[in-house]
């Protein structure tokens, strides 16, 4: 653990985590559903950081967001999310109501940036210079970047001080073309010239580790400052590993 993370664990001040959402909400699926932020990726990690006493800030490059329609109907969390998102006084809804614009935030204020998935990432992150600049400056502070599923492409489109992608020569995981087939979106992605993170990572020299199983099991890879999860079921685990790294405990 580096000095920055040790200090966060020892101080009485709450460590701060930034949830960085993609800002796209619009058409994607063949059946007419829109994509955006995966609500499961957001909610599962939010619970972990909140329960461990982190100060949570939510932002996107534009200050806008929308939830992926299909993720909001995920049967694994539908009952819980219905109660959460119908309550304007819950902590998550209050944070979302006050979502910040990324260019108004200081990267050095945070010890973790957590990026939830959703196919909106493929529309947003390859072109969002504000996101790329923020992540570059945050990475230089030695903070931890957590990314899940489609969000991992942000690591491929952000360069470090050497001009290489953040994930070049790093062990990472994320969605593969098999996952896109499983999700029924491969034809859509081909039509839009979108690529899976696995394809992108291998083409820029990342050390991509494919998950042995989709859906059922989480699959998490840590390498230095990068904590990546292969799928939505990895969101909770990625957040927990980042908490352990910052607070230096084995719980």
From Swiss-Prot:
Where is it localised?
A: Cytoplasm; Nucleus
Any GO BP annotation: cellular detoxification
Which GO-annotated molecular functions does the record name? glyoxalase III activity
Q: InterPro entries, alphabetically?
A: Class_I_gatase-like, DJ-1/PfpI, Prot/Nucl_acid_deglycase
Q: Name one GO cellular component term.
A: cytoplasm
Transmembrane regions: none
Enzyme Commission code(s) on record: 4.2.1.130
Q: Which UniProt keywords apply?
A: Cytoplasm, Lyase, Nucleus, Stress response
Give the main location. cytoplasm
- Give, as one word, the top-level EC class: lyase
In terms of superkingdom, the source organism counts as: Eukaryota
Catalytic activity entry: methylglyoxal + H2O = (R)-lactate + H(+)
Q: Which SUPFAM superfamilies match?
A: Class I glutamine amidotransferase-like
Task: Give the record's family classification.
Answer: Belongs to the peptidase C56 family. HSP31-like subfamily.
Q: What does this protein do?
A: May catalyze the conversion of methylglyoxal (MG) to D-lactate in a single glutathione (GSH)-independent step. May play a role in detoxifying endogenously produced glyoxals. Involved in protection against reactive oxygen species (ROS).
The protein's name in its UniProt record: Putative glutathione-independent glyoxalase hsp3105
From which source organism is this entry? Schizosaccharomyces pombe (strain 972 / ATCC 24843) (Fission yeast)
């Amino acid at each position: 653990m580096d000095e920055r993370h040790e200090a966060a664990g020892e101080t009485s001040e709450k460590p701060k985590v930034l949830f960085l959402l993609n800002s796209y909400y619009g058409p994607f699926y063949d059946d007419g559903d829109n994509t955006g932020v995966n609500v499961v990726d957001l909610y599962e990690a939010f619970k972990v950081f909140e329960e461990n006493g982190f100060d949570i800030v939510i932002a996107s490059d534009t200050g806008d967001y929308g939830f992926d329609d299909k993720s909001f109907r995920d049967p694994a969390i539908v009952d819980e999310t219905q109660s959460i998102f119908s309550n304007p006084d819950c902590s998550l809804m209050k944070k979302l109501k006050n979502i910040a614009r990324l260019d108004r935030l200081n990267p050095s204020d945070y010890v973790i940036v957590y990026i939830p998935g959703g196919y909106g990432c493929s529309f947003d992150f390859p072109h969002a210079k504000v996101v790329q600049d923020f992540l570059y400056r945050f990475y230089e502070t030695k903070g931890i970047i957590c990314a899940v599923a489609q969000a991992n492409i942000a690591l491929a489109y952000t360069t470090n001080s050497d001009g290489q992608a953040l994930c070049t020569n790093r062990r990472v995981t994320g969605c593969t073309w098999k996952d896109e087939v499983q999700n029924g979106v491969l034809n859509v992605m081909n039509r839009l010239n979108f690529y899976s993170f696995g394809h992108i990572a291998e083409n820029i020299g990342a050390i991509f580790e494919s998950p042995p199983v989709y859906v059922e099991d989480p699959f998490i890879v840590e390498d230095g400052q990068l904590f990546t999860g292969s799928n939505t079921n990895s969101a909770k685990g990625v957040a927990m590993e980042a908490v352990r790294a910052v607070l230096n405990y084995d719980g």
